[in-house]
Regions:
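Structural motif
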Residues: 27-28, 54, 81, 152, ...
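Active-site-adjacent beta->alpha loops and helix N-cap segments on the catalytic face
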Residues: 14-19, 39-54, 66-76, 90-113, ...
Length: 234
């Protein structure tokens, strides 16, 4: 897959979302968008259908994590929304991820890309040890989750850019690394711990970067998006 920038549309309503998207109406290539929990839970499938109608690709990030049968049935519903990519939590086990893939696969054999979350970019080793009782290093945990994801037949993982090269080393160059935790060099890291810049993210192995506030909260979102594309895609 070619390198690309995904804008995280972390808005609370359709009105806010479309006001933002209207800024890009003159862009020749419509940005790839991430729809997360807040917007999807507020607006439901209708928001997905309308954004697709406007010509955008969609990463529907709901991070499913439940028993395999429940996830399989949920994915069967999501498969009808014509999104381009969706995800689950790798911690849900190989069995759950396989069930997710089966549920997402349509009768004609096609399906959206399916990836799994390894460790959130807000996670640190200290939190893993103290709150989750995980003594393994964060790098070892991410590699193991990535290997499980590949074994389940998924297309890639969500990880920090700092671990993207490591994931490719363990799972192959064709295995997608989708990375949040990207900020401009002169920007605020906010609540994320493991972050880097767009240019550095590409250098160390990110295939797709997910960027929210540095674009959506910018004084000129279109200019910020173009800057991000220039730094990451070239």
């Amino acid at each position: 897959m070619q390198h690309d920038v995904i804008i995280a549309c972390d808005f609370k309503s359709a009105e806010d979302t479309f006001r933002f998207l209207d800024l890009f109406k003159d862009e020749e290539r419509k940005p790839f968008l991430k729809i997360g929990m807040e917007l999807f839970y507020a607006e439901g499938p209708a928001i997905v259908r309308e954004i697709k109608r406007r010509g955008h690709r969609i990463f529907l990030e709901l991070k499913l994590h439940d028993i395999p049968n429940t996830v399989k049935k949920a994915m069967a519903v999501l498969s009808r929304l014509d999104v381009d990519m969706c995800n689950v939590h790798a911690a849900g086990t190989i069995e759950m991820m396989r069930a997710a893939r089966e549920g997402l696969t349509r009768e004609d054999g096609t399906r959206p890309l399916l990836i799994a979350v390894t460790q959130l970019t807000s996670t640190s080793e200290e939190r893993m040890r103290e709150e989750l009782l995980i003594d393994a290093s964060i790098n070892d945990t991410i590699v193991k989750y990535a290997q499980n994801t590949r074994a389940a037949g998924l297309d890639g993982v969500v990880c920090s850019p700092l671990e993207a090269g490591m994931v490719h080393g363990a799972c192959g160059e064709e295995f997608l690394t989708v990375t949040p935790g990207v900020r401009f060099a002169d920007g605020d890291v906010a609540d994320q711990v493991r972050v880097t810049t767009p240019a550095r993210a590409r250098e160390i192995g990110s295939d797709l970067i997910v960027v929210g506030r540095p674009i959506t909260a910018a004084e000129d979102p279109v200019a910020a998006y173009r800057r991000c594309v220039a730094e990451f895609v070239g």
